[in-house]
Amino acid sequence: MSTFIGQLIGFAVIVFLVVKYVVPPVRTLMAKQQDAVRQQLADSKTAADKLVEAEGAHAKAIEDAKADAAQIAEEAKADAVQISKQLREQADAEVERIKVHGQEQIVLQRQQLIRQLRGDLGAESVRRAGDLVRSHVADPSAQSATVDRFLDELSQMAGSVGAAKRPVPGGYSGMHAASRESLAAQVSTFRETAASLDSSALSALAEDIAAVAELLISELVLRKHLSEPVDASENEAKLTLVNSLLGNKIGAPALAIVRSAVTARWSASSDLITSLEYIARLALLERAERDGQIEDVEDQLFRVSRVLDAEPQLATLLSDSTAPAQGRVALLTNVLGGRANEVTTALLAQTVRLLYSVRAEVAVLDVAELAVARRDESVAHVKAAAPITDAQRTRLAQVLGQIYGRTIAVQLDVDPELLGGLVVNIGDEEIDGSLSTRLSAAALHLPN
């Protein structure tokens, strides 16, 4: 019994301890657990509600997406139809463009082919014509006939021009009026002075005048001073200077001409040198005429001119003003080799010494034309495919004389490339009646 009571008391103590210390925490824990369960249930309900809402939103989004997809598909179909239409239109336009371009290309190629065929046919025709002409003019009589036909045409030209005197360019026509008047005055002074001189004195005069011109070429300040226009009262100073410089170095005839030249009015200082050079040439030509050698001198001068034209290297060496004049004159003398007479040699040496603004071949041609012009003649430089007869030369000179109103001296060069006819040059004018030029003109006027 006591055991039972003891056990009961122990049980009661245990119950008390459990109720006192175990039950409150358990209750608290259970309350918390219940709150947690309730919260979870609430959250679960909220989640379920959100799930329902999400499912509804998803379904709505699917419906909207289907509607948008249907609209996009309709728009895409419409765009596809429009694009297909545009592509068809573009393709049709491109086909039409290619078709038109192809037709244009066909037309252009046809025209080009026609032009090429015309050009080839024309060129072949000209070539064949050239062959026929060359074959024809191989006969000397036919060659001569081409010259006669040219002379006939030239005669018709002479009839249409009339007898009015035409100006022929000269080597000194580039001077201004004042210089031309002064040069004419110096020529008059020379003629008065030369009237009393013999051949040797004329040569001495030419040498003295050329020496003065050579001095003025090298002494620019002196040339400028002597050629400057001054009042009549100041001319005495020029004359005094000339006397002091040249009085004991040149002869009295040359000194008189130089004194006259420095008191004249010149448009440019170079014109003073040109006038002295002109007088020096006239002195030698006057000697040649008095000695009966003028025609030989003319012929030799023209021959040398043609040699210089044919030998540009020789002309360049003679024209090199930086080389000593003595060396250039020696070169000229070696080239002449004694084949020119004394006057021609002196004229050529003088010309080479005084070169300073023109080439040798031009200066020599000027001297040759001056020799002819002294007799109121002009020179016609004529080219022919073959030598012409004396009768043709005479007729040519007569016809040209009718055209230019003055005597014409004919200088002939042979150039087989002309084929036939003649080419006439007088001064700056050219009359081209050669067959080669006519063939070239025919080739230029071929249809395109």
Curated annotation (Swiss-Prot):
Main subcellular localisation: membrane
Entry annotated with the keyword DNA-binding: no
Region (ATP synthase subunit delta): 169-448
GO MF annotation list: proton-transporting ATP synthase activity, rotational mechanism
Pfam families on file: ATP-synt_B (PF00430), OSCP (PF00213)
GO cellular component: plasma membrane; proton-transporting ATP synthase complex
Stretches for region ATP synthase subunit b: 1-168
Classification via InterPro entries: ATP_synth_B-like_membr_sf, ATP_synth_b/b'su_bac/chlpt, ATP_synth_F0_bsu_bac, ATP_synth_OSCP/delta_N_sf, ATPase_OSCP/d_CS, ATPase_OSCP/dsu
Subcellular location: Cell membrane
Transmembrane spans: 4-24
Keyword vocabulary terms for this entry: ATP synthesis, Cell membrane, CF(0), CF(1), Hydrogen ion transport, Ion transport, Membrane, Multifunctional enzyme, Transmembrane, Transmembrane helix, Transport
Membrane disposition: Single-pass membrane protein
HAMAP family per record: ATP_synth_b_bprime, ATP_synth_delta_bact
Subunit note: F-type ATPases have 2 components, F(1) - the catalytic core - and F(0) - the membrane proton channel. F(1) has five subunits: alpha(3), beta(3), gamma(1), delta(1), epsilon(1). F(0) has three main subunits: a(1), b(2) and c(10-14). The alpha and beta chains form an alternating ring which encloses part of the gamma chain. F(1) is attached to F(0) by a central stalk formed by the gamma and epsilon chains, while a peripheral stalk is formed by the delta and b chains.
Family named by the database record: In the N-terminal section; belongs to the ATPase B chain family. In the C-terminal section; belongs to the ATPase delta chain family.
Role, per record: F(1)F(0) ATP synthase produces ATP from ADP in the presence of a proton or sodium gradient. F-type ATPases consist of two structural domains, F(1) containing the extramembraneous catalytic core and F(0) containing the membrane proton channel, linked together by a central stalk and a peripheral stalk. During catalysis, ATP synthesis in the catalytic domain of F(1) is coupled via a rotary mechanism of the central stalk subunits to proton translocation. This fusion protein includes a component of the F(0) channel (subunit b) and of the F(1) subunit (subunit delta). Two copies of subunit b and one of delta together form the peripheral 'stator' stalk which links F(1) to F(0).
Protein name per Swiss-Prot or TrEMBL: ATP synthase subunit b-delta
Lineage of the organism: Bacteria, Bacillati, Actinomycetota, Actinomycetes, Mycobacteriales
Gene label: atpFH
